[in-house]
Amino acid sequence: MPGLVERKEAHGETTLVVDPARLVEACTHLRDEEGFNFLADIAATDYLGWGRCGVAGYIGTTAGRDLNLPGSQGLAKLPEPKPKRFAMNYHLLAIPPRQAPPPPDAGARVFSGMVVRAVPPDSPPRGTPGRETTRRVRVQVWLDDGEPISSVVPVWPTADWHEREAWDLMGIRAEGHPNLSRILMEDDWEGHHLRKDYPIGGEPVRFSG
């Protein structure tokens, strides 16, 4: 596959790590040559503070919260460092074409306008070899802070809103997107509030009984 860096198998799932510079080429190959005709979701993850890099002022606290101490945040050991700060995960489906039912035959019975047929004894059950089922794969790219990624809207139009969400919440820019604007927050909102370095402030509220 074009741009393939690594193939990972875990928990029955396949992840294809791809060179960001060849993302569109890889996605086009998966659509045209491997049958992955539907993009279900794009999930962006911020790994700031993951591994052995200290983060000062993590999520806006005064002194910062060190995620690198063993046992912190429920971690029994230090996690392995990630290749870059952000991961973009593209969840793809290969949905087989729907086949038209065969015409009624002499052995079929009709109930309330519906044709009912007995399943042939040699028909393979759903989910077994011999019967085409939906396949899944995850395409993953790693990005540094501020590093853009090419839009895959020309490959799968469903990427439109997903890429806008990644921009709105994480600040990941999809170059070539037809309308890369905020999708959840106001247009004049400052920053991208699902980033781990986004300052979470607050105003004291006085309650009276």
Give, region by region, the residue ranges found by the protein language model.
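Terminal low-complexity/charged segments
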Residues: 1-209
